[in-house]
Design a protein with these regions (language model features):
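Extended beta-strand/beta-hairpin segments
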Residues: 1-51, 62-150
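Alpha-helical metal-binding/catalytic segments enriched in His/Glu/Asp
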Residues: 56-57
Length: 150
């Protein structure tokens, strides 16, 4: 039996390349492109992808440990993303995530098992690695569809 959950958020253009991304009950963030396109008033989408990957990996490691009643007192991650032109268009071509975790109090056997499993628990990383089908619809103000693509 398969399970499925959905999530939603909304995005609104404020000015230039600055957007308000509304996460409903979680509040909102402002995103922007760096100069010369935008004014750098917030993280750009590529940084959000990097943050999502690293956050999910860290949460997945915690999940794998918590299943065995283990916990990390501290953890941080550093992300280095690389963008490059691919077939004439800018793309994220690599995301390096370095996680530093205080594992001193974790049972070594449980830690070893968690290290082998945690990436499989990460929804974001595994989805990006496999490729995510994305359906795009572009509509004008009257609701007429200008583009529908997969």
């Amino acid at each position: 039996m398969s399970e499925s959950n959905t999530f939603s958020l909304s995005l609104e253009l404020l000015e230039n390349f600055e957007f308000k991304v509304d996460f409903d009950e979680y509040g909102y963030i402002i995103t922007d492109e760096p100069p010369p396109l935008g004014n750098g008033e917030g993280p750009n989408p590529a940084r959000l992808v990097g943050a999502a990957v690293a956050n999910c990996l860290c949460a997945s490691l915690l999940f794998a440990l918590k299943k065995k009643k283990q916990w990390l007192p501290s953890m941080r991650a550093d992300i280095l993303g690389e963008i490059a032109k691919v077939e004439g268009f800018w793309r994220i071509v690599k995301i390096n995530v370095e996680i530093q975790a205080d594992t001193a109090a974790v049972d070594p056997e449980i830690l070893n098992t968690a290290v082998q499993q945690f990436e499989n628990f990460c929804i974001v990383t595994q989805s990006i690695r496999r490729g995510i089908p994305i359906h795009v619809e572009l509509k004008n103000k009257t609701g007429a569809t200008l583009l529908s693509s997969d």
